[in-house]
């Protein structure tokens, strides 16, 4: 591992020299990108090397010093350095882990009310609010691609495009069944009801990764409708795209024009086709490895939200927090960061 870190540091230094001599602006940009990727690892490795030097100096003091007070201080410093070395080495191991190729991607996030009738749709709306607040805290951009409100309030489904930095690395653990336990506003007896919403997070497909021939897509237009199906305009601005080879169909009416709805529908369609490809690949990979943090499948129950007890439980890692009210205000890192750490531990154990 240390040999690998030395190679990375040497590469970083070579790139720094190249940058000083490079005149081509495009080449400079590429070099700067590569430097920024290597910089966190090199900085941490330099910290580790400094600790090694300090440790050697302390060892010398312990061998040569006679003063008991200084020896006591040196022993304390030695323990501190050893602890810092271990922490730094663990951090370096994580930085050297293979990166998920999708981690830097934007995502399309879909939320659907599932079992539990109207309460499921209300919970879907609550989840939407939470994810939007979380995205805002990260300075991510959120665009609603398609939104289907339910008749009695809440949402039957919604699809968002979330754009920004390293989004999939944070949100990829959100796919699955989210279960809510609470007393509905209409419940006169005060009984707790259980309902569910399904979340699906898919990395946004790029043109180079997925080629779709427009000859394979059927386009239908129709009038936009509101909750309950009533028509809300007289022009056919809503669009349905059907990918004939896969049978995947997407309808979109959120935009103000047919052109806007067609663009949004195509974004969703690409994502669903892409997800179909990724799911098949993931199923094959899951046959060969244990995945403690979950499969990411939409049928997997991942989390329970218990409102009467202000409790949230992530079933994949056995995490329980009495902070549901805070988390629903967008503080999702309280759950997501432990999931990331558990996934890293799993990777380290398998590497």
Curated annotation (Swiss-Prot):
Keywords: Cytoplasm, Methylation, Protein biosynthesis
Modified residue annotations for N5-methylglutamine: 230
InterPro entries for the chain: PCRF, Pep_chain_release_fac_I, Pep_chain_release_fac_I_sf, Prokaryotic/Mito_RF, RF-1
Compartments reported by the entry: Cytoplasm
One Pfam family of this chain: RF-1
Membrane spanning residue stretches: none
Molecular functions (GO terms): translation release factor activity, codon specific
A GO cellular component entry from the record: cytoplasm
PTM remark: Methylated by PrmC. Methylation increases the termination efficiency of RF1.
Subcellular location, principal: cytoplasm
HAMAP family in alphabetical order: Rel_fac_1
Function: Peptide chain release factor 1 directs the termination of translation in response to the peptide chain termination codons UAG and UAA.
Family listed: Belongs to the prokaryotic/mitochondrial release factor family.
Protein name per its UniProtKB record: Peptide chain release factor 1
Species of provenance: Onion yellows phytoplasma (strain OY-M)
Lineage: Bacteria, Bacillati, Mycoplasmatota, Mollicutes, Acholeplasmatales
Underlying gene: prfA
